[in-house]
Amino acid sequence: MASSIKDVATHAGISIATVSRAVNTPERVSPETLARVQAAMEALQYRPNALGRQLRAVRTGLVGVVLPSLANPVFAECMQGIDEAAASAGQRVMLMTTAYDREREARAIETMLQQRVDGLVLTVADAAANPHLDRLDAERVPYVLVYNDTQGQPRMPVRCSVTVDNRAAARDAIRALLALGHRQVRMLTGTLSASDRAALRHAGYRDALQAAGIVPQPPVEIDFNAEAMAPAELDRLLAPPCPTAVFCSNDRLALLTIRALRARGLRVPEDLSVIGFDGLAMGQWLSPTLATVAQPHRQIGIDAARALARRIAGESVPPITLAHRLLPGGTLAAAPMAPAGSSGATDSTDSTVFFPTSDTQGASR
């Protein structure tokens, strides 16, 4: 079997991106690194795939799109924007989803390359440490990230992306809760390792609480694809010190939270305030309306498709950060004098109160 650029990187003890720079722009690497790459290439008898680059120079008019899920309206709205902009540019679109699974992500990218797409628009689990993006860089395949924030992140090369500032947006959400008197704010999120967006929102949650002198509680993580919150997960969310507000890493999880709280006999926002992240239209159809941080999903898709067209044409395109908006909604209220579940009496020496649990609320099972 012929050696690959990944084999060369492993043999030399460096990244795929560094091997790519040594091959394509040797002036950008140190003489020592260049020597290591050349030695590894000779040892493995590796030759850069000039034929592959020539094939990709022939345009197909096909754009690949890799997204986590269309069940989440966030990505469906983004896809609408991508499709509109691509159609206006005379491009065809090929879509694959990954279900937040890194192996499926790898297979989707490989399939796209086999189909000889001109470029890719994609959302990946982690843009900081991603061998698939390193491979695209190495093979000079144009791509644009959506929702992955690559600016100012440690260990992360700056890559072309279209997103909001997730960390700053989460800080704004928590500051809105703090302004209403909330001091016990819990976070519900999908699996942090499956989404660098959720990880940045968690960082913003921590930033805002710590700036206010409040020790953040550990987040409660559940499956991004969950259709309902398990009783044990709700117990963890409501465990002492009892929260008066819940920040959810996306609107879909916020809607699951509200449904679970109501099934437990708790009122939103009278007993607990809930704020999500995304700005889904369905959240504004509820009564009360969902408080959320809104992202311009369709515009993210449009801007990403346009940026990709520029990259395919050979232009250098910097990351694009769009504005977010805080929608207060009806699920926010001032912090209650005592969290739900208390007897109404307070004791200045012991203000611990308890919510009903799945063990005491049989109907919630």
Regions found by a protein language model. Name each.
Residues 43-49, 103, 124-126, 258:
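Short gly/ser/thr-rich secondary-structure transition/capping motifs
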Residues 43, 84-89, 137-365:
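Bacterial carbohydrate/catabolite-sensing allosteric modules
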Residues 5-14, 19, 29, 37, ...:
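Hydrophobic packing within well-folded, soluble alpha/beta domains
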